[in-house]
Regions:
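Bacterial N-terminal signal peptides that target proteins for export
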Residues: 1-10
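N-terminal entry module detector
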Residues: 2, 19-22
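Hydrophobic h-region of N-terminal signal peptides that target proteins for export
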Residues: 10-20
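Primary mode marks residue(s) on the alpha4-beta5-alpha5 output face of response regulator receiver
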Residues: 23-194
């Protein structure tokens, strides 16, 4: 009996991974519902949603303004959706372009983007810009929830430092902290338990 339970448990864990690895995009309505899930409810209806067409290419699934949400990549091994202020789109879009061109190192992507911000090619927001995301777990289209997903909330403040914000550069308990201080990608990290 114990072996049977373990096999069934393994099948439950492996099935979503195999399905995701097949690379078939979810139906448009499901992609939209999952993509906007990290947002506060009052932002969901107006957000622009980028998702995947039948050809597997990123496309606009729904026009909107204020926030941009990315649906789950059907080729990714785990569930991840994110939404960010549209003022961050030049920076985010450039990251997607670099990954699509074969650059896979996060450090290399940031090196290119930081150089382009410095040269004026990428314009960063003048005011703080939020990002909301959900990672792991999986989206349940029947309930419209993502059981087991972890929330992440950040606020981008380009070039902010510990001195300019009064925030530590190291995480401590449930306190906010600043990550990548002094760079174009400087942002305040918030824990979901706050």
């Amino acid at each position: 009996m114990r072996i049977r339970e373990l096999l069934i448990g393994a099948l439950v864990v492996v099935t979503p991974i195999v399905t995701a690895a097949q690379g078939t995009p979810a139906p448009k309505a499901e992609q939209i519902a999952a993509a906007v899930l990290p947002l506060p409810p009052d932002f969901r209806a107006s957000a622009r949603v980028l998702g995947y067409g039948a050809d597997g290419k990123l496309t606009t699934l729904r026009e909107g303004k204020g926030m941009i949400c990315l649906a789950r990549d059907p080729k990714a091994p785990r569930f991840h959706v994110a939404c960010y202020a549209e003022s961050m789109e030049p920076f985010m879009a450039r990251g997607r372009e670099l990954r699509a061109s074969g650059v896979t190192s996060a450090a290399e992507i940031d090196t290119v983007r930081f150089r382009e911000v410095k040269s004026g090619k990428i314009i960063m927001p003048k005011f703080p810009a939020a990002l909301y995301s959900l990672t792991d777990g999986d989206f349940d289209p029947k309930t419209g929830t993502a059981p087991g997903a972890r929330h992440l909330y950040v606020v981008y403040i380009p070039y902010a430092t510990a001195e300019s914000t009064g925030l530590s550069t190291k995480p401590f308990g449930n306190q906010p902290w600043i990550m990548l201080p002094g760079t174009p990608k400087a942002h305040i990290m918030f824990t979901s338990s706050m």
